[in-house]
Design a protein with these regions (language model features):
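Blade-level signature of beta-propeller repeat domains, shared across WD40, Kelch, NHL, RCC1
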Residues: 189-226
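Short loop/turn segments that connect beta-strands within the blades of beta-propeller domains
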Residues: 10, 18-20, 28, 49, ...
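Short loop/turn segments that connect beta-strands within beta-propeller blades
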Residues: 26-30, 67-70, 115-119, 168-172, ...
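Recurrent small/Gly-Pro-centered beta-turn motifs in extracellular repeat architectures
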Residues: 18, 57, 99-102, 148-152, ...
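Structural motif
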Residues: 19-23, 60-65, 106-112, 155-165, ...
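A short beta-strand motif characteristic of beta-propeller blades
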Residues: 1, 30-36, 71-79, 120-127, ...
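Repeated scaffold domains used in trafficking and secretory/extracellular systems
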Residues: 2-9, 37-48, 81-90, 129-141, ...
Length: 226
């Protein structure tokens, strides 16, 4: 099997992203389909409990695919600004998809929330906050708590303080912000990028640092608050 930028599998399928093409395989490694609906498709994620994947393009597009029927469910263009490599994930129950986006400029971020029946955006959050920059997010599968990694700019627009916060999905606000060191932030930013790839060797080669310590946002958040 070819070397992919990202690779994922569940109980039924395997998915590999080359950038140009999304390859679908069965569990035995037999190729079932190749999708080329969105360019620069480097990362993907399985919806919990279903054979549906979200594919994210660094060009600012999303694609949602049903692997049982091997078809594109929906294609969304958020922006044509490049370098869209921030974090994304499904909620633990699969009812929502969360995507960190940069629709206006590479210096501004927002959090897009999509319901997963029709993959329609239901909320755009933090778009007016010019000081807070979002980078990665993760859910605790047991508690449903969402942790968000980011940083705050100072009055000059320069990165000032790095943080992990609880994102309250009901009130759609950041709560209980814990500030972390620049070293912790830099490691987590790169580690989470590698994690989004499914920990592939090809992506690791471009991380240019040792990622020997397995860390979650939850672990660092709890340690910062102790």
């Amino acid at each position: 099997m070819r070397r992919f930028w990202s690779f994922y599998q569940n109980e039924s399928y395997q998915v590999g992203c080359s950038g140009k093409t999304v390859y679908i395989y069965d569990k035995a490694g037999n190729e079932l389909a190749k999708f080329r609906d969105i360019p620069y498709a480097y990362t993907a994620a399985f919806m919990p409990g279903k054979n549906i994947i979200a594919v994210k393009s660094t060009e600012g597009r999303l694609g949602f695919y049903d692997l049982d029927s091997l078809c594109l469910l929906k294609r969304i263009t958020i922006t044509r600004i490049g370098a869209q490599d921030e974090g994304f994930c499904f909620s633990p129950d699969g009812s929502f998809f969360y995507n960190i986006e940069k629709p206006i400029t590479s210096l501004r971020t927002q959090l897009g929330v999509y319901e997963t029946n029709t993959f329609t955006k239901v909320s755009t959050l933090f778009a007016e906050d010019v000081r807070t920059v979002l980078r990665h997010l993760e859910f605790d599968e047991k508690t449903g708590t969402c942790y968000l990694l980011g940083y705050v700019r100072n009055d000059m627009g320069v990165r000032d303080r790095d943080f992990i916060a609880i994102f309250n999905t009901e009130s759609q606000t950041l709560q209980d912000i814990h500030f972390i060191s620049q070293k912790q932030y830099d490691y987590l930013e790169i580690y989470k990028h590698w994690e989004l790839s499914g920990f592939t060797e090809k992506t690791l080669e471009w991380c240019f640092c040792d990622l020997d310590e397995k860390l979650s946002l939850k672990e660092v958040y709890e340690a910062a608050g102790s």
